[in-house]
């Protein structure tokens, strides 16, 4: 049952007993009591009182509407087997995105849009730019056709839709009031794009123009997964181990999982809140990982014994964490990245020790010998003129500046 308003409910019948039970209002002496023998009137009063109690239970104090959650999922699964094995998200989990960060009784609706990433999602699929544009229009229509309060939750590419919608509403005088909307973003790729490119830069390979951060009038929740290349990219991309670890986190371990995290389990030191000039808050939850994504990948895909994972993690984590140290990131030359491969064999001794302890000393000896050979081979490696052509091809995919 739905009452158009508390005043509409209580104005129907004026009787002290009804007021006292259903609305808690004071008795009015001007209203005469019911006659004891008036059975029909008693039934009428009882029915209205029951209806008003239902209104009170549904609406609580004052007038309110049921909460709604609009959910914008991430990129759709790839039709290609090898790519699907690297990134796969079960569509059945879409309604659960961000569910721990809003009212659990909210009615959930998944906003339909392509969720495509040409060519990963198919040679005939739309580009990221086209997909985000369609998603923004669909989300905007859903917001305007839904009574508040509304929680808008997005994952990965879905957060690009949320970012664009917030920017649109920031300049729209007909936008819903600030208290009606809350945006929840898990694994926002714009964190990576803002780190790599200036706002207004068009990235041809994904047909996407990097937006400027919007000064939104709505409260926002950001969910950031530690080491996730999309939401927590390395500050120093010249650290190749950190790059590999971030790719592992973004592709398979950790990126999507942040959408299902529980804010109650996040340590206070990993929760930050800022307030912008419009009075809206942005609360960031930093979801830490107990094991490096790269180490998990080594266990799952490279045969690293699980009992060796802790030792390898302890050896690699300090090296990887150096890429996240605060301060301006140094300029990176593509040649420096290639030459940085020389440092990778240095991790082999750390891996060789636990492997040897679990599979025999001969394995450790063989690994050490292979490490020495690889180190000697890479010591003489150099990026010469032969690499210029390849680097030129890569530059062709890089941003060309603003797109008008």
Swiss-Prot record:
The keyword Chaperone does not apply. It is a single-pass membrane protein. The chain crosses the membrane at residues 43-63. Activity is potentiated by the SL-1 transporter MmpL8. Inhibited by the lipase inhibitor tetrahydrolipstatin (THL). It is an enzyme of class 2 (transferase). Residues 104-325 form the PE-PPE domain. It catalyses: 3 3'-(hydroxy)phthioceranyl-2'-palmitoyl(stearoyl)-2-O-sulfo-alpha,alpha-trehalose = 3,6,6'-tris-(hydroxy)phthioceranyl-2-palmitoyl(stearoyl)-2'-sulfo-alpha-alpha-trehalose + 2 2'-palmitoyl/stearoyl-2-O-sulfo-alpha,alpha-trehalose. Disruption phenotype: Inactivation of the mmpL8 gene interrupts the normal biosynthesis of SL-1 and leads to the accumulation of the precursor SL1278. Keywords: Acyltransferase, Cell inner membrane, Cell membrane, Lipid biosynthesis, Lipid metabolism, Membrane, Transferase, Transmembrane, Transmembrane helix. It is found in: Cell inner membrane. Residues 64-404 are cytoplasmic. Signal peptide: none annotated. GO terms for biological process: lipid metabolic process. Involved in the final steps of the cell wall sulfolipid-1 (SL-1) biosynthesis. Catalyzes two successive acylations of the precursor 2-palmitoyl-3-(C43)-phthioceranyl-alpha, alpha'-D-trehalose-2'-sulfate (SL1278) to yield the tetraacylated sulfolipid SL-1. This is SL1278 acyltransferase Chp1. It comes from Mycobacterium tuberculosis (strain ATCC 25618 / H37Rv). The lineage of its organism: Bacteria, Bacillati, Actinomycetota, Actinomycetes, Mycobacteriales.
């Amino acid at each position: 049952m739905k009452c158009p308003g508390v005043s509409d409910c209580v104005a129907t019948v004026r009787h002290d007993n009804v007021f006292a039970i259903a609305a808690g209002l004071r008795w009015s002496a001007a209203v005469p009591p019911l006659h004891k023998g008036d059975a029909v009137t008693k039934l009428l009063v009882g029915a209205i009182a029951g209806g008003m109690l239902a209104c009170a239970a549904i609406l609580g104090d004052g007038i309110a509407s049921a909460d709604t959650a609009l959910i914008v999922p991430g990129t759709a699964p790839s039709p290609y087997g090898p790519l699907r094995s690297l990134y796969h998200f079960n569509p059945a989990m879409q309604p659960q995105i961000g569910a721990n960060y809003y009212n659990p009784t909210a009615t959930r609706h998944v906003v339909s849009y392509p969720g495509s990433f040409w060519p990963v999602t198919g040679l005939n699929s739309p580009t990221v730019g086209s997909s985000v544009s369609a998603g923004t229009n669909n989300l905007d229509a859903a917001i305007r056709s839904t009574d508040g309060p509304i929680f808008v939750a997005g994952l990965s590419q879905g957060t690009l839709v949320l970012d664009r919608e917030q920017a649109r509403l920031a300049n729209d005088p007909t936008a819903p009031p600030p208290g009606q909307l809350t945006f929840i973003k898990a694994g926002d790729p714009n964190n990576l794009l803002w780190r790599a490119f200036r706002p207004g830069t068009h990235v041809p390979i994904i047909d996407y123009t990097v937006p400027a951060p919007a000064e939104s009038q709505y409260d926002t929740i950001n969910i950031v997964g530690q080491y996730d290349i999309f939401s927590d990219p390395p500050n120093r991309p010249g650290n190749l181990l950190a790059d590999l670890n971030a790719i592992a986190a973004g592709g398979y371990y950790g990126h999507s999982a942040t959408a299902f995290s529980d804010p109650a389990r996040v340590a206070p030191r990993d929760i930050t809140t800022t307030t912008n000039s419009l009075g809206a808050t942005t609360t960031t939850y930093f979801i830490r990982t107990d094991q490096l994504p790269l180490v998990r990948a080594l266990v799952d895909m490279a045969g690293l014994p699980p009992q060796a994972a802790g030792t390898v993690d302890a050896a690699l984590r300090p090296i990887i964490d150096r890429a996240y140290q605060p301060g301006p990131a140094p300029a990176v030359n593509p040649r420096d990245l290639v030459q940085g491969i020389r440092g990778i064999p240095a991790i082999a001794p750390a891996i060789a020790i636990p492997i040897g302890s679990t599979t025999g000393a001969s394995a450790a000896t063989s690994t050490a010998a292979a490490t020495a050979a690889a180190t000697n081979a890479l010591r003489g490696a150099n990026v010469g003129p032969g690499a210029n052509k390849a680097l030129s091809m890569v530059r062709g995919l890089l941003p060309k500046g603003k797109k008008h």
